[in-house]
């Protein structure tokens, strides 16, 4: 019985639910296949249907003969193209060096002809940029001269990390030589970035030539009620590393003592000058405890002189940044943050000079990278660490070099300089009587002991701070034109020596002067290229109109004559003299 049951076949009867379910799946599958076949039809799967000529056609033989001849022509053309391709390939295989040179010269000539207009446009653009920069430099110097003329006290702001490198003796000469009894006070800003002992040494060094004070501007982002601390509260390193302002009370007390000792009953104007991005506007905001002036991490934010009222006795004047340079090399200006890092064409040379100032272990620890043998290897590893890659995974070494310069300017790479050694009996360029009188006016002696006592209590680790050699005070550039005093001092934009601007402009009538949109001269304008192209287009149209007018005038002059053209000049004959062109 068991074997009989095993041999019996399983019934094919299905439930209605399962049967309809299977049928539905089959329908869906077939529908999906048809849809896919419509989207991707198989090419060449079906044979092309032969075009047959019916026998009743009277010219069947002639038509077939023409078709056969057409096929033969196509085949002959295909074979001819094949033979020509083979011959060309054989000819190129044995190509000589002279023919390759001739081919290269021909292609370079064609390329030069095609891109000749582009080179002219680039030269014109460089010329316009140079002229614009020259105008900006003169405008910035005029603003600096206004600040010196209107101010009673001038605050020269320098970087505490390199005070000599960010100071210029020409500012002091301008203040001493200006009409009126003007005073100069040196402010060591960014005092939180250097060790206390180093800061104290710099204060003692500059006290020999005039009043000086340390300062740390506020880095808070709110619009008003900026934080401020007194020097007596600056007892720990943590207090110095905060975002609040330190040293404002001392500076305001010095200015108040100056007003009181000089018997000034009205108010004084205090000008704030220095190189770009040294913290002039930040100092004014810290003193006023508000956003009185625009500030930014890039140089050139302040464009013109701004006057801010601190209180009833003191008015502050903000000045655009000025740069005194003696040559065309801009590496020092970049490392002092006086020039934008994004404008540097070759950041590798300047970044390599930064890497040479410290050991490899210092930068490997700072950027968390492995040891390197060459500077190129360092930039590649740093770019990979930053996640900066170009196409095909190539490290962006340019971005890495610019990042090193930004770290140098923002204080991530900590450094300081030592004041020069002063020998006994060494003379100062300012007489001792002037120094003592200025110290009495500002009452510096009362604050000197307090500063020294506080700075001695503040000990800071100097392991991660490297000592570098200062580049020395900035010198004035040789003037281009002796009659023009504005060329003696250049502003925050440094012109490349290769791009020589125009020495002068020809006088033009007011009707013929080109009116330039002042918005195009702004550095922040994003539609600069569009505006320049539009101006060039208008200029071309005007030139075409002028040429047409000139050609019409010349035609009239050629056809016009004062003398008689013939013996019949006395009587005009319409048929003979009138000529239709």
Swiss-Prot record:
It is found in: Nucleus, Nucleolus. The modification Phosphoserine is found at residue 99. One of its GO terms (molecular function) is GTP binding. Residues 141-325 form the CP-type G domain. Residues 64-108 form a coiled coil. Residues 500-517 have a biased composition (Basic and acidic residues). Belongs to the TRAFAC class YlqF/YawG GTPase family. This is Guanine nucleotide-binding protein-like 3 homolog. It comes from Drosophila melanogaster (Fruit fly). The gene is Ns1.
